[in-house]
């Protein structure tokens, strides 16, 4: 299993980057004994000004053939943390690669959303795409703690 976080834009040094790195390091430590691989963070920039379509091309080229494509989108399905953990466990148990895609400021191209195995939302509000990275990294860590039976996730 390979786990990719594909994101448009480069996260500069600062609190958001620190949080993403911290949560992904926690995920790696917690997930390794569970058979979850470290997250490969891929950042893309459309330097030619092609917008969402060019960004979609860059993301699509990076996604491994046969990988489950999960897109973060305001129109996506709102999952609970345990439901997200169940998805992650299912992909792990089936040996399927997973690519989690976060679009730029304008979102993701419709053709990439249509191709997704799962469109996921962090609620009906729109979030800055750089903050979504932090939220997704935290949810990955939370999912690993749920699968490990750790007390981090409380209901």
Swiss-Prot record:
It catalyses: pseudouridine(1915) in 23S rRNA + S-adenosyl-L-methionine = N(3)-methylpseudouridine(1915) in 23S rRNA + S-adenosyl-L-homocysteine + H(+). It is an enzyme of class 2 (transferase). GO terms for cellular component: cytoplasm. CDD domains: RlmH-like. Gene3D superfamilies: 3.40.1280.10. GO terms for molecular function: rRNA (pseudouridine-N3-)-methyltransferase activity. InterPro entries: Alpha/beta_knot_MTases (IPR029028), RlmH-like (IPR003742), tRNA_m1G_MTases_N (IPR029026). It is found in: Cytoplasm. SUPFAM superfamilies: alpha/beta knot. S-adenosyl-L-methionine binds at residues 72, 103, 122-127. Keywords: Cytoplasm, Methyltransferase, rRNA processing, S-adenosyl-L-methionine, Transferase. Specifically methylates the pseudouridine at position 1915 (m3Psi1915) in 23S rRNA. Belongs to the RNA methyltransferase RlmH family. HAMAP family: 23SrRNA_methyltr_H. This is Ribosomal RNA large subunit methyltransferase H. It comes from Cereibacter sphaeroides (strain ATCC 17023 / DSM 158 / JCM 6121 / CCUG 31486 / LMG 2827 / NBRC 12203 / NCIMB 8253 / ATH 2.4.1.). The gene is rlmH.
């Amino acid at each position: 299993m390979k786990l990719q976080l594909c994101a448009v834009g480069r996260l500069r040094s600062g609190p958001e980057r620190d949080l993403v790195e911290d949560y992904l390091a926690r995920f790696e430590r917690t997930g390794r004994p569970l058979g979850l691989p470290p997250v490969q963070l891929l950042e893309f920039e459309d330097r030619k000004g092609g917008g969402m379509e060019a960004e979609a091309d860059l993301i699509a080229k990076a996604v491994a053939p046969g990988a489950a494509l999960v897109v973060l989108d305001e129109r996506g399905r709102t999952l609970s943390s345990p439901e997200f953990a169940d998805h992650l466990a299912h992909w792990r148990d089936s040996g399927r690669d997973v690519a989690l895609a976060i679009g730029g400021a304008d979102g993701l191209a419709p053709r990439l959303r249509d191709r997704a195995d799962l469109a996921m939302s962090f609620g009906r509000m729109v979030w800055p795409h750089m903050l979504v990275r932090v939220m997704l990294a935290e949810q990955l860590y939370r999912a690993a703690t749920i699968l490990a039976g750790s007390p981090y996730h409380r209901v």
